[in-house]
């Protein structure tokens, strides 16, 4: 796109400056300067992106001296620019391929080395237990001798075990006491309960009757005492009794009376 635009501008300038020889020299110089100014940013960008391509692009674009009023043609510019663009596209498209290519040989090398490495590892593992046994037999661990003195921290688990054993004994004793105290069957419990209920009801009835008839009971007991102890059954007593009954006939109705 830049080459076509530059070609169009150069053709228009050539047509305008064609009338005189002096004008042709000035026009050629002006065109060379304009082309140089236009191509400077393009060349800078090309150098930053692809340094090897700068030599190919910068070689044809050479500004001639003021004495020689010649400048490169548009065809040369287009031909010099097109390989650069082609090389850019080719480099961009071919850039990922070199990264993918070395991976395959590395994988093949890994696959070729894996069996041998695995065999070596297996041999090392098979040979390592023997050395471990030898070191265990010899007792040389590369460490100082173990101090067999008792440590208070080491005694803590024993205290814990003693406490646990005591708790287990207490729990077993509690279980034994619970097993000893067994409740009777439900039928026996019901029968005993009914029997106790009858006894309690009888006692309550006796207390109730005696409380409400306490005066009568007291009079009955006292009258018997008077008759048995104090009042003798003599002739005088019978006469007095007859006289009282005759004088008070209403006393015959009641037997309980006090003299």
UniProtKB/Swiss-Prot annotation:
Superkingdom field: Eukaryota
Signal peptide feature range: 1-44
Positions where Phosphoserine occurs in the chain: 165, 223, 250
Membrane topology label: Single-pass type I membrane protein
Record field: transmembrane: 191-211
Low complexity bias spans: 82-104
Sequence segments annotated as region (Disordered): 47-155
A Pfam match: KCT2
Glycosylation sites: 54, 68
Keyword terms of this UniProt record: Glycoprotein, Membrane, Phosphoprotein, Signal, Transmembrane, Transmembrane helix
UniProt-recorded name of the protein: Keratinocyte-associated transmembrane protein 2
Source organism: Mus musculus (Mouse)
Gene that encodes it: Kct2
């Amino acid at each position: 796109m830049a080459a076509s635009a530059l070609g169009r501008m150069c053709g228009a300038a050539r047509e305008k400056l064609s009338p005189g020889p002096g004008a042709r020299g000035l026009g050629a110089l002006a065109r060379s300067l304009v082309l140089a100014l236009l191509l400077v940013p393009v060349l800078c960008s090309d150098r930053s992106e692809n340094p090897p391509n700068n030599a190919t692009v910068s070689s044809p674009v050479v500004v001639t001296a003021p004495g020689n009023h010649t400048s490169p043609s548009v065809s040369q510019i287009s031909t010099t620019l097109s390989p650069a663009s082609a090389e850019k596209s080719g480099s961009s498209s071919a850039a990922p391929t070199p990264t993918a290519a070395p991976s395959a040989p590395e994988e093949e090398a890994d696959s070729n080395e894996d069996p041998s490495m695995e065999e070596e590892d297996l041999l090392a593992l098979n040979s390592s237990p023997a050395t471990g046994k030898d070191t265990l037999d010899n007792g040389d661990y590369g460490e100082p001798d173990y101090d067999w003195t008792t440590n208070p921290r080491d005694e803590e688990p024993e205290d814990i075990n003693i406490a646990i054993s005591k708790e287990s004994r207490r729990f077993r004793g509690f279980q034994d006491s619970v097993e000893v105290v067994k409740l009777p069957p439900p039928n026996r419990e019901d029968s005993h309960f009914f029997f106790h209920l009858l006894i309690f009801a009888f006692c309550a009835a006796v207390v109730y009757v005696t409380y409400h008839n306490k005066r009568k009971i007291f009079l009955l007991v006292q009258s018997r005492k008077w008759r048995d102890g104090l009042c003798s059954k003599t002739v005088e007593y019978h006469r007095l009794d007859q006289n009282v009954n005759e004088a008070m006939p209403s006393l015959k109705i009641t037997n309980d009376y006090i003299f």
